């Protein structure tokens, strides 16, 4: 079970000088068990809480990069300036939205992520004025029947172009060798 999503486009950056407060904002999430969807639920047991797909104690994650990578943002890394740049996401949803909302005040203005769900639903995260907005959207496909072609005709056209290129190249080489 679960709902799979992937980022179609992502450009989210946390500036170097804001990494520490952003990481602290993530650690502060740990104090509110009501936000956590993961946990253990045995009768007569002490109930344990954690965020989906995350360790129970977020402080075991060493820094913001570790947090975001554990959340599922692959290839999250530092750029040459030392800013943290989020990588792509392609997995089940967990609670990424809460973590990114928590660090929104520290995310570079104008950052965004465009998401596509397994049911072809689109939405966008936009970061402005220290907030993350979730914006639903839809994609429309436009077909161009007047530009239609057959695969075989396209293959032949490509072969003709390659033959013409080869002939031109052979002529040029012959001229160069006679010079």
Give the location of each predicted region.
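Short, extreme N-terminal segment that most often corresponds to the first beta-strand
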Residues: 1-45, 175-179
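Charged interaction segments
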Residues: 50-179
